[in-house]
From Swiss-Prot:
Family statement drawn from the similarity comment of this UniProt entry: Belongs to the AccA family.
PROSITE patterns referenced in this protein's UniProt entry, alphabetically: COA_CT_CTER
Gene Ontology cellular-component annotations: acetyl-CoA carboxylase complex
PANTHER family on file: ACETYL-COENZYME A CARBOXYLASE CARBOXYL TRANSFERASE SUBUNIT ALPHA, ACETYL-COENZYME A CARBOXYLASE CARBOXYL TRANSFERASE SUBUNIT ALPHA, CHLOROPLASTIC
Domain of life according to the entry: Bacteria
Reaction it catalyzes: N(6)-carboxybiotinyl-L-lysyl-[protein] + acetyl-CoA = N(6)-biotinyl-L-lysyl-[protein] + malonyl-CoA
Keyword Lipid metabolism: yes
GO biological process, one term: malonyl-CoA biosynthetic process
Keywords tagged on the record: ATP-binding, Cytoplasm, Fatty acid biosynthesis, Fatty acid metabolism, Lipid biosynthesis, Lipid metabolism, Nucleotide-binding, Transferase
InterPro entries according to UniProt: Acetyl_CoA_COase_a_su, ClpP/crotonase-like_dom_sf, COA_CT_C
Enzyme class: transferase
Name of the protein this chain belongs to: Acetyl-coenzyme A carboxylase carboxyl transferase subunit alpha
Length: 319
């Protein structure tokens, strides 16, 4: 699959296009007098150096674009790459099965765990089927049902957050969107099993928080976490979505700032160029972090887990 380059990556895209052209010429005529292999190698090294230079100085808006990258790995990609024996569970047992939230039982290094995560789509039909990763109340109620099942069977819960926000449609509001989110916040704070949450892309508002109350909260290096999108913030404060880059900087949506504020525990490094450049390497790093987090939490009693989670929540907002 060819890479899609973002606006700020255009210098890299131009180099990669040259590399592709030279490679194509080399394949067509192996009897050329010039040594194309050496030139391709030189350009590849230059591309890596340029990528390092650009990614060493990314702004919040550029990171927001990376968090939304169409080729970025989604929940089911990480399930496939980092877990074994995944069995998906469906439905909230009340209304419907929301495809914007996926969940089920899997094994992490042989250990049974419950996985719950937002799921976006890549092609148009899949995007519509997944509602662009924006869950309705039935999605959050499905998530809660799976969490309660995990607690009953003493399984750790692992959540993956990647949503622009909860779906704001009339039907979702009529079916109790705010109640479903609020109930999840309350019930997650009371769970008697370890809960590890990881923001893998967009962490949008209450739609993210509804599966984001945990004992450990991680973010991938180029993910974001915020109460509103930069475009939404800009529309409110400056009456123009064009001010989104300014809003992104002001909001503090990136992982280093959130770790500084003690809202997250760990930042998981991404491969050079972002998780979509090497999903396998990203999944390996994510798996290692999850195993380390569970090892830390396994030594705690049920009461210790609940007390620590309570203290964590109560500390938010204090310097």
């Amino acid at each position: 699959m060819s890479l899609n380059f973002l606006d700020f990556e255009q210098p890299i895209a131009e180099l990669e296009a040259k590399i592709d052209s030279l490679t194509a010429v080399s394949r067509q005529d192996e009897k050329l007098d010039i040594n194309i292999d050496e030139e391709v190698h030189r350009l590849r090294e230059k591309s890596v150096e340029l990528t390092r230079k650009i990614f060493a100085d990314l702004g919040a808006w550029q990171i927001a674009q990376l968090a939304r990258h169409l080729q970025r790995p989604y929940t089911l990609d990480y399930v496939r790459l980092a877990f074994d024996e995944f069995d998906e569970l469906a439905g909230d047992r009340a209304y419907a099965d929301d495809k914007a939230i996926v969940g089920g039982i899997a094994r992490l290094d042989g250990r049974p765990v419950m996985i719950i995560g937002h799921q976006k789509g890549r092609e148009t039909k899949e995007k519509i089927r997944r509602n662009f990763g924006m869950p309705a109340p039935e999605g959050y109620r499905k998530a809660l049902r799976l969490m309660q099942m995990a607690e009953r069977f003493k399984m750790p819960i692992i959540t993956f957050i990647d949503t622009p926000g909860a779906y704001p449609g009339v039907g979702a509001e009529e079916r109790g969107q705010s109640e479903a989110i609020a109930r999840n916040l309350r019930e997650m704070s009371r769970l008697g099993v370890p809960v590890v949450c990881t923001v893998i892309g967009e962490g949008g508002s209450g739609g993210a928080l509804a599966i984001g109350v945990g004992d450990k909260v991680n973010m991938l290096q180029y993910s974001t976490y915020s109460v509103i999108s930069p475009e939404g913030c800009a529309s409110i404060l400056w009456k123009s979505a064009d001010k989104a880059p300014l809003a992104a900087e002001a909001m503090g949506i990136i992982a280093p700032r959130l770790k500084e504020l003690k809202l997250i525990d760990s930042i998981i490094p991404e491969p050079l160029g972002g998780a979509h450049r090497n999903p396998e390497a990203m999944a390996a790093s994510l798996k290692a972090q999850l195993l380390a987090d569970l090892a830390d939490l396994d030594v705690l009693s049920t009461e210790d887990l609940k007390n620590r989670r309570y203290q964590r929540l109560m500390s938010y907002g204090y310097a």
